[in-house]
Amino acid sequence: ALQTDYIDLYWLHRDDLRFSPGEIVERMNQWIRQGYIRYFGVSNWTAKRIMEANEYAASHGLSGAVASQIQYGLGICTPSDWGDSTIVCMDNSEYMAYEKLQIPVYGYSAQAEGYFPLYIRGGSGALGSDTRKKYDTPVNRIRADRLKQLMKKKQYSLSWIMAEYVLRSSFPAMFIMGGSNESRMKEIMGQYNCGKKQLTDEEWEIILKTTP
């Protein structure tokens, strides 16, 4: 179906806690030796499990996980907010672990399902029920209010701000984003290609302060 002899990067989409990290590493390396895949990454694994897997791989002369995919963006949320205990969301402990791991992190839901532009325009009442459940928290409201204040002083792309938040990480990181129309996608990719920062470090400090 894929019309290819091998997969460059094979993603394990969910962790399976019935198996030890070492068992999973062994199976992935079997596929690498057989030529089915070149590398493997993990999606919705905790950093702790990734560390265990990669430590096992290193001690046995095997290939470990080369990339991770978790929920990561300016919009803070939790698995409980999503109603799904099998996903992993970026938090302080995960962030510090990735600073040690230094493997690429692909952040999904980096746009927080449009939470910030919707909230800035119309408050909580402008949000759909699913977005409200996942993202309408005190921390995210504070961040939205600060973005709104900055918008009064300078013009910038909210879509690109969402991407810039992930790209400014202290480890390799990439955003996974979508757009409702072609112009939005061109806007995001245009900003990415020019590589220009919209916010200063001082402005980011204002947005990310944990107190009102």
What are these regions (language model features)?
Residues 1-20:
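Active-site groove signature of glycoside hydrolases
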